[in-house]
Curated annotation (Swiss-Prot):
The organism of origin for this protein: Bos taurus (Bovine)
Entry-listed glycosylation sites: 92, 100
Family according to the record: Belongs to the TMEM8 family.
PTM characteristics: N-glycosylated.
Entry function: May function as a regulator of the EGFR pathway. Probable tumor suppressor which may function in cell growth, proliferation and adhesion.
Gene name of this polypeptide: TMEM8B
Disordered, as annotated region: 1-37
Signal peptide segment: none
Protein name: Transmembrane protein 8B
The entry's keywords: Cell adhesion, Cell membrane, Cytoplasm, Disulfide bond, EGF-like domain, Endoplasmic reticulum, Glycoprotein, Growth regulation, Membrane, Mitochondrion, Nucleus, Transmembrane, Transmembrane helix
Entry GO terms, CC: endoplasmic reticulum; mitochondrion; nucleus; plasma membrane
Subcellular location: Cell membrane; Cytoplasm; Nucleus; Mitochondrion
Length: 472
């Protein structure tokens, strides 16, 4: 990933000690006044792809009218080729003394170029460089080169007087410029619409911007296909407010005495809302805590909601149900730490919970010798609609959702999953608190245990019997 080929690709001398202007005529030698030394720079490494170059007695540079100033910047192999080389020239207008002075800079690789007194160019034969210009009208010039070639870069600065396209050598005006050169991972840290990431391809390490919200370019500054502020706000509101569909399942769970399940649904609704508020690209972002924490809690709440709903449908013994709830929370936390975006993090717990549900319903059906749940109304008005809604949500999530339609397909996913919980959550088990006439409760040490009616109160009050005597 080298720089553009406009700089030439012919083998050149590695580092000449000085810059010479070609003499007139064949065999002639350059006069001594046309030989200028190359001024080295100091290198200060701060971090990966973060290097500052300092010049002696800088950062201001005085440019006398009779000769240019040449600086050498050394980029090391591997360490510097994956960043962005930035150069900034700033003209000190107060040093011009009302002269019409223009400062030209020419940045070339491996071989310096001399700037003439008349026509100013930054190319010669097969060698080309980057030209910078500062004057009283335009005081600052900036240049950025992503993924620069390693080796020695030469910056030649020359001050000339007059108005273009032809200039003349200044007589008594000494221009002063401020030079700032550094190597950074990304262009302007990718701005508000991007994130600078350190990447590796085979053995090549480099940094690049990951742009969001439709922005493009080296520094995420190209807004040709960018999303508008209104569109960003709409997508954020849809993803956040769609989680309010969990409110009906929470109310239904509390009314049915499923307090633990209601707590899990509330946890999921809260962290899913604020995770999507923090996860949005662009500037419509609101984070109440660290992004990684919000993402973990959102994923854990989503998986736990599926887990507790299916386990509640199995109608297991309270002790077994509590053990499965706790075991599921611990195993899901471990799985999310291992691979948060893995497919089996969603399918594995769901299939295991469905296996428990199928086993519990099969055992209960065999013991009762009829289908469980026993009422056709529950199958027709609860289980079938809930299963269809949940299946549709899974199909949308797995096969329809893309990066382009994420904001509204994922919002529909929120609403469908929350709606399916309201259908699938089983009704409250009815309990008959009436004690048979032949039984008398003991006031000290024992209590009567009455059978709980499991399905919609199908057994009448007269059918309640004392099942056992439990030690308190």
């Amino acid at each position: 990933m080298n720089m553009p080929q406009s700089l030439g690709n012919q083998p050149l001398p590695p580092e000449p000690p000085s810059l010479r202007t070609p003499a007139e005529g064949p065999g002639a030698t350059s006069p001594p006044e046309h030989c200028w030394p190359v001024r080295p720079t100091l290198r200060n490494e701060l971090d990966t792809f973060s290097v500052h170059f300092y010049i002696f007695f800088g950062p201001s540079v005085a440019l006398p009218p009779e000769r240019p100033a040449v600086f050498a910047l050394r980029l090391l192999p591997v360490l510097d080729s994956g960043g962005v080389l930035s150069l900034e020239l700033q003209l000190n207008v107060s040093s011009l003394r009302q002269e019409n002075v223009t400062v030209f800079g020419c940045l070339t690789h491996e071989v310096p170029l001399s700037l003439g007194d008349a026509a100013v160019t930054c190319s010669k034969e097969s060698l080309a460089g980057f030209l910078l210009t500062v004057s009283a009208a335009s005081r600052v010039a900036r240049l950025r080169i992503p993924f620069p070639q390693t080796g020695t870069w030469f910056l030649t600065l020359r001050s000339l007087c007059g108005v273009g396209p032809r200039f003349v050598r200044c007589r008594n005006a000494t221009a002063e410029v401020r030079l700032r050169t550094f190597l950074s991972p990304c262009v302007d840290d990718c701005g508000p619409y991007g994130q600078c990431k350190l990447l590796r391809t085979h053995n090549y390490l480099y940094a690049a911007c990951e742009c969001k919200a439709g922005w493009r370019g080296w520094g995420c500054t190209d807004s040709a296909d960018a999303l508008t502020y209104g569109f960003q706000l709409l997508s954020t509101l849809l993803l956040c407010l769609s989680n309010l569909m969990f409110l009906p399942p929470v109310v239904l769970a509390i009314r049915s005495r499923y307090v633990l399940e209601a707590a899990v649904y509330t946890f999921t609704m809260f962290f899913s809302t604020f995770y999507h508020a923090c996860d949005q690209p662009g500037i419509v972002v609101f984070c109440i805590m660290d992004y990684d924490v919000l993402q973990f809690c959102d994923f854990l709440g989503s998986l736990m909601s599926v887990w507790v709903t299916v386990i509640a449908m199995a109608r297991l013994q309270p002790v077994v149900k509590q053990v499965l709830y706790l075991l599921g929370a611990m195993l899901l936390s471990m799985a999310l730490q291992l691979d948060r975006h893995g497919l089996w993090n969603l399918l594995g717990p769901s299939l295991f919970a469905l296996g428990i549900l199928a086993t519990a319903w099969t055992v209960r059906s065999v013991r009762r010798r009829h289908c469980y749940p026993p009422t056709w109304r529950r199958w027709l008005f609860c289980l079938c609609p809930g299963s269809l809604i949940a299946g549709s949500a899974i199909l949308l999530y797995a096969f329809v959702e893309t990066r382009d339609n994420y904001f509204y397909i994922h919002s529909i996913w929120h609403m469908l999953i929350a709606g399916s919980v309201g259908f699938l959550l089983p009704p409250r088990a009815k309990t008959d608190r009436r004690v048979p006439s032949g039984a008398r409760a003991r006031g000290c040490g024992y209590q009567l245990c009455i059978n709980e009616q499991e399905e919609l109160g199908l057994v009448g009050p007269g059918g309640a019997t004392v099942s056992s005597i439990c030690a308190s």
